[in-house]
Amino acid sequence: MARQEAGQGSPSGGQPTLWAISDLHTGHTGNKPVAESLHPSSPDDWLIVAGDVAERTDEIRWTLDLLRRRFAKVIWVPGNHELWTTSRDPMQIFGRARYDYLVNMCDEMGVVTPEHPFPLWTERGGPATIVPMFLLYDYTFLPQGAMSKAEGLAIARQRNVVATDEFLLSPEPYHTREAWCRDRLASTRARLEQLDWMTPTVLVNHFPMVREPCDALFYPEFSLWCGTIKTADWHTRYNAVCSVYGHLHIPRTTWYDDVRFEEVSVGYPREWRRRKPYSWLRQVLPDPRYAPGYLNDFGGHFVITPEMRAQAAQFRERLRQRQSR
């Protein structure tokens, strides 16, 4: 794959820029060259890596080390895939111990994590406090027809939509993933409350901070594993100029309450080969101020072909029929 210079199709002009990317999934054949193609546009560029780098700890280390040697600062938050413990992983550690191991690994490489002091971006588009967060999810993004986690999971199982997290993402020492989420919410909120409210923030979380992006999911039941309603007002409460996330594999730009939300995922080869973006890296700061027509009808950074529209319509019809049974 050709070298991907940061800023292609954007007005960075070789000046310091804050970029973001997520869901590199470098353990998948075809995605490692994507990571290898990423380069800054200036020596002072920063890069946000919003989770799902890989699943094996050695592959996570390889990817973050590669990026840290190229960018002036790398800021990482975990996705659900980093927290999986698979039989192929050289480190058989689980739950919070696994997260702590990854934080220590990043610390050794000079990569910023949710456990470090929040870095302050003072270049173009700043000042802005970059807030990397690890919040997980609590099953409150319920699918239609559900009033509780149990009902939501029952609907999801009936429709054969069950996240692999249920088998590979251990919450230990917590009893449940939602208990871990509650703890992370409390500790993160306490740190956010200490920020200077006059300084804008860039909120970074693997999962979307609001429910609305999940409306674009082909399988709406998957929303159960996509976030928490407890963060619905954080982008306004904590003075965000941008909220960066991934997870959904629906890369696009949207606005909620006049705050820009950037879903910056690469996704799996079978996905991005159909709708390869103009640039792998997404500009966060300064505000890219997209030109009219740059974003497609859904906020995506790629051209929608007639074939794509036809395939999407066919898929949604099959989905409607499945849900009506």
What do these predicted ranges mean?
Residues 129-202, 209-218, 313, 317-323:
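Active-site-proximal loop/helix segment associated with metal-binding centers of metalloenzymes
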Residues 30-34, 53-69, 81-109, 122-125, ...:
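Metal-dependent catalytic neighborhoods of phosphoester/phosphodiester hydrolases
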Residues 9-19, 118-132, 200, 255-260:
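Beta-strand-turn-beta hairpins that frame and shape the catalytic cleft
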Residues 62-68, 113-125, 147-149, 186-199:
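Short amphipathic alpha-helices and their capping/turn segments at secondary-structure boundaries
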Residues 25-26, 54, 81-83, 120-121, ...:
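Short, solvent-exposed loop/turn segments at secondary-structure junctions
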Residues 20-22, 47-52, 75-80, 113-117, ...:
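Active-site neighborhood of phospho(di)ester-bond hydrolases with catalytic His/Asp-centered motifs
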Residues 2, 109, 215, 221-239, ...:
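Binuclear metal-dependent phosphoesterase catalytic core
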